[in-house]
Curated annotation (Swiss-Prot):
GO biological process, one term: 'de novo' IMP biosynthetic process
Protein name: Bifunctional purine biosynthesis protein PurH
Domain MGS-like: residue ranges: 1-148
Modified residues annotated as N6-acetyllysine in this record: 287
HAMAP family for this protein: PurH
An annotated Gene Ontology molecular function: IMP cyclohydrolase activity
UniProt pathway: Purine metabolism; IMP biosynthesis via de novo pathway; 5-formamido-1-(5-phospho-D-ribosyl)imidazole-4-carboxamide from 5-amino-1-(5-phospho-D-ribosyl)imidazole-4-carboxamide (10-formyl THF route): step 1/1; Purine metabolism; IMP biosynthesis via de novo pathway; IMP from 5-formamido-1-(5-phospho-D-ribosyl)imidazole-4-carboxamide: step 1/1
GO CC terms: cytosol
Family statement: Belongs to the PurH family.
The encoding gene: purH
Lineage: Bacteria, Pseudomonadati, Pseudomonadota, Gammaproteobacteria, Enterobacterales
Entry domain remark: The IMP cyclohydrolase activity resides in the N-terminal region.
Catalysed reactions, semicolon-separated: (6R)-10-formyltetrahydrofolate + 5-amino-1-(5-phospho-beta-D-ribosyl)imidazole-4-carboxamide = 5-formamido-1-(5-phospho-D-ribosyl)imidazole-4-carboxamide + (6S)-5,6,7,8-tetrahydrofolate; IMP + H2O = 5-formamido-1-(5-phospho-D-ribosyl)imidazole-4-carboxamide
Disulfide bonds: none
Domain of life, per lineage: Bacteria
Amino acid sequence: MQQRRPVRRALLSVSDKAGIVEFAQALSARGVELLSTGGTARLLAEKGLPVTEVSDYTGFPEMMDGRVKTLHPKVHGGILGRRGQDDAIMEEHQIQPIDMVVVNLYPFAQTVAREGCSLEDAVENIDIGGPTMVRSAAKNHKDVAIVVKSSDYDAIIKEMDDNEGSLTLATRFDLAIKAFEHTAAYDSMIANYFGSMVPAYHGESKEAAGRFPRTLNLNFIKKLDMRYGENSHQQAAFYIEENVKEASVATATQVQGKALSYNNIADTDAALECVKEFAEPACVIVKHANPCGVAIGNSILDAYDRAYKTDPTSAFGGIIAFNRELDAETAQAIISRQFVEVIIAPSASEEALKITAAKQNVRVLTCGQWGERVPGLDFKRVNGGLLVQDRDLGMVGAEELRVVTKRQPSEQELRDALFCWKVAKFVKSNAIVYAKNNMTIGIGAGQMSRVYSAKIAGIKAADEGLEVKGSSMASDAFFPFRDGIDAAAAAGVTCVIQPGGSIRDDEVIAAADEHGIAMLFTDMRHFRH
């Protein structure tokens, strides 16, 4: 049963005025009476639209610098009144039914994001009347349509045209869901902000409490339902943040291939975030959330060829990420050489997509070009709780490194050390990465002891016939014993980059000196669990 409700009267009060004039014109052209407030009313009047100010309708002026505009029984009675049940009392108090409410809220998020925003500024951008109208209309969705997103304007007009000026219950219910999501997200932002301001508010500190309020409210929007999760007996969906500011797997568009799986998305994220570390043309190949080959080159084809050489066996069925447009030559090389689950790049040429289309199962994603990395939060779910931390955006340059051994690294060793240090950040701990000439030649990931990660990296290099002598090695955390250095030296490593900080640093440095290895301390750790 459609349960259509005609739209005869609409109340419009928006902070974000994108598209509101055109929407109001369309409503007016269909005989809808327009009520409005403040700046929205002035804008519509300036455009020649017949509009009644809410203060004229209620007979009560706006007051307290606009804090009180719509908090009136004639407004909320018109929204909440149940058609066919409350008609008599509405008529007794001269309350006209309001069939549609078009509201978006004061820009609280934009206000508090501004540098130097005071608590007073934030408070004045907490909307009261707006959320009240939104919730009233959503509660009475059986009779009233609530519109909080400008992206819905065109579809609403089309449905009205298809239904003789009416909207169906299904549409009103869908709009009500969006409305409650909108107010929930809005209240969450305010609660998070106030929660982080508690010490400053009570005079305990001049600074806010930081990024972590005492109650953490999160809002994510479902982007995809998945066939299943990490395993086939687990149900799953993919949720994303609204207004993501950095190109990511969350913002990516799938331009080709079958549906993404849970594991595809997780691995694609790992590959893309790693390739973002490099300014030069780069390729990252990931398998089970770990890089199995990384390289930079003169072109992305060169980078791919070199990354693939690290571990062709593991590259089978992997995820490939680039930091440049996917071109036809590179696409052909991939398709001719290996089975690949996902290719992600900032963009893809038409010629490249024609080539990858020959393999229907290959998923191709484009995410747009990225700029600077955006600070944010990382989450890890534990049973009954949530671990929250800042994203690991830590970086070191050559000028920040400390040479702690007798021998200084050569220029090439230094370049390779910085290269494999970037890669190690994205390898599961304990992480060891061997690199030579700006390509990985062996990766040891996820071992419970660091020395075994070092041994595995050497074994991988030997298995592929890659020359380790003269290579650099990165370790995501300090060496607790000298055995990792001994293993690296036995494989042929001549330079080591690591955080330092072990109580046995002296022994580790002495081991490096014994082997003639140059050692660099970053004073920064990159655990990844």
